[in-house]
Design a protein with these regions (language model features):
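Beta/alpha (TIM)-barrel catalytic core signal, keyed to glycine-rich beta->alpha loops juxtaposed to Asp/Glu
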Residues: 1-154
Length: 154
């Protein structure tokens, strides 16, 4: 299920959807082996609602990433580079040993608990090569990621 707004907005928003309701519909239609296993949503250092907005569950106790983990739904992140807006100088904070903004943007997304992988539209072989370079760096540990979130929010 590819989305833009529905899992990132408040529950009273016209486009809001509950992932729990979506799984229930999938089970009603397809049974226990329904095949609804993945969602795609925008996520990056600035479109961070998937990580920060608790809008899922009966009491809004889960973010979409927490709910997806709970339900066994994999999450792919679209716009990890925010259509190259995150690549401009001085937009992203420095962290780790990564000098390139594209690497920092990708590392943030791929280190986020609950995200399977960032999805990047690449227009040239050079972009593919640059984006593959980040795979040589291990994802951040939970502690490192938590520390980065604290740094970003301070």
């Amino acid at each position: 299920m590819a989305t833009w707004e529905c899992f990132r907005v408040a529950t009273d928003h016209a486009q809001y959807l509950s992932i729990f309701d979506m799984v229930k519909i999938a089970k009603d239609v397809g049974g226990q082996d329904h095949g609804f296993r993945f969602i795609q949503l925008p996520y990056n250092m600035y479109l961070d609602q998937a990580l920060t907005v608790k809008n899922q569950g009966d009491s809004n106790q889960y973010t979409i990433l927490e709910a997806a983990i709970h339900l066994g739904i994999g999450v792919f992140a679209s716009v990890p580079l925010m259509q190259a807006k995150l690549l401009a100088p001085n937009v992203l904070p420095e962290f780790g040993q990564m000098s390139k903004p594209s690497h920092r943007a990708m590392q943030f997304v791929r280190s986020t608990p609950g995200i399977i992988a960032p999805l990047v539209g690449q227009k040239s072989q050079a972009h593919v090569q640059e984006n593959l370079e980040v795979l040589g760096t291990p994802v951040l540990s939970e502690t490192e990621f938590s520390d980065l979130i604290k740094k970003l929010s301070s």
